Amino acid sequence: MANFLKLKQFLTLVLILLALAAKSSKSTPSPSSTTRVKGIYWIENPLFPPSSIDTSLFTHIFYAFVSPNKFTYKLEEEEEDSTTVATSLTTFTNTFKTKTPPIPTLLSIGGATSNSTLFAFIASDPTARATFINSTIQVARTFGFDGIDFDWEFPTTTKEMNDLGELLFQWRRAISDETASTSRPPLLLTAAVYFAVNFFLSGERRMYPVDSINKNLDWVNVMSYDLRGSGSNVTGAPSGMFDSKSNVSVVSGLFSWIRGGVAPEKIVMGMPLYGKSWKLQDPNVHGIGAPNVGPGPGVDGGMAYFQVVDFNKQMGAKVVYDKETGSVYSYSGSTWIGYDDPFTVSVKVGFAQALKLGGYFFWAAGYDTSDWKVSTASKAWRPES
């Protein structure tokens, strides 16, 4: 821990210099609002209803997920005969409207299991695109959401990235037109995006439409996690701040967005409330990069943070803070788990604030401990004058 504390002190000095350099080197105008995003995604879960969320910790809450119909291009919720989905959406928004102050909610469309090919067609076809956009605005307004979040995982070609840029342009125009005709406050428009501004690990090299993002989105939720997955044959930091051997890290990814031209205040850093586990090939070889034979406990090795805490306690696991990656992991026997804890989250939040980013978000509600240990650590974001 002592070495990690030194790392934190070093980071503070370095990040201030980097933040100043980034600010002076970019001409992209920053949003006028000084509000910082402190968000969390909620997944439909009867064991963790929206009312269980500690709203004192968050400024925005996302409903995950809804999807368009592959034949009509309208959100399923607009055509749903059953009242089940409508009740879920209404309960969600009403839960946060009654808070003091009310907490803005966003309807998130897509997700990791959504139909990427369908999104590609919608983005490229003017008729399908208009139908989809109008449906999202209609559903958001009907159920009382304050904004729309788009999670396309992921555009696979340069053309699809260009089409995404046009989709965002038309979406913003439709939101502005709706506001002009109804005198309602404009819906927020955000997008969940890859950890880096460009895709360089596989497939066609392509870059997000930065100009369209700056002009049409309120912010992007950068998924700075899942950097190492169950398919890897060695252990790794799933959301490590650094990687001396590659550009696959939180720091590299966020700086790619800034260097790419996105205004820092439009970049919101994502953090996971879960870890990734592996089964070690040799329990005596247990550092970062140790060979493994496959996923450990959990679905595909995924473990909610509260499950990691329980595992560490029950198994007497050794907890290690790794200064090379700026991450934490634990191991016991053949089980190895990489994750974020309150300390690493406080470091990341300090990093985001030093860079003058737009804020942070967590995936996902219900994964933290019952007393919100990790989420509470995000209070490392200091009040701004």
Curated annotation (Swiss-Prot):
Bilayer-spanning residue ranges: none
Domain GH18: 36-385
Gene3D superfamilies: 3.10.50.10, Glycosidases (3.20.20.80)
Keyword tags: Glycoprotein, Glycosidase, Hydrolase, Nodulation, Signal
Glycosylation-annotated residues: 115, 134, 233, 247
Function of the molecule: Symbiotic enzyme that hydrolytically inactivates Nod factors (NFs) with a C16:2 acyl chain produced by the microsymbiont Sinorhizobium meliloti. NFs are lipo-chitooligosaccharide signaling molecules produced by nitrogen-fixing rhizobia to initiate nodulation (symbiosis) on the roots of legumes. Controls NF hydrolysis at the stage of root hair infection. Involved in the regulation of growth and branching of mature nodules. Modulates NF levels and signaling to complete transition of infected nodules to functional nitrogen-fixing organs.
Protein name as it appears in the record: Nod factor hydrolase protein 1
Conditions for induction: Induced in roots by Nod factors and infection of the microsymbiont Sinorhizobium meliloti.
Gene Ontology cellular component list: extracellular region
GO molecular function: chitin binding; chitinase activity; hydrolase activity
Active site location: 153
Family to which this protein belongs: Belongs to the glycosyl hydrolase 18 family. Chitinase class V subfamily.
Gene Ontology biological process terms from the UniProt entry: carbohydrate metabolic process; chitin catabolic process; nodulation
InterPro entries, per database record: Chitinase_II/V-like_cat, Chitinase_insertion_sf, Glyco_hydro18_cat, Glyco_hydro_18_chit_AS, Glycoside_hydrolase_SF, Glycosyl_Hydrlase_18
Signal peptide: 1-21
Pfam families noted in UniProt: Glyco_hydro_18 (PF00704)
Recorded consequence of changing residue 295 to S: Abolishes Nod factor hydrolase activity
Primary gene name: NFH1
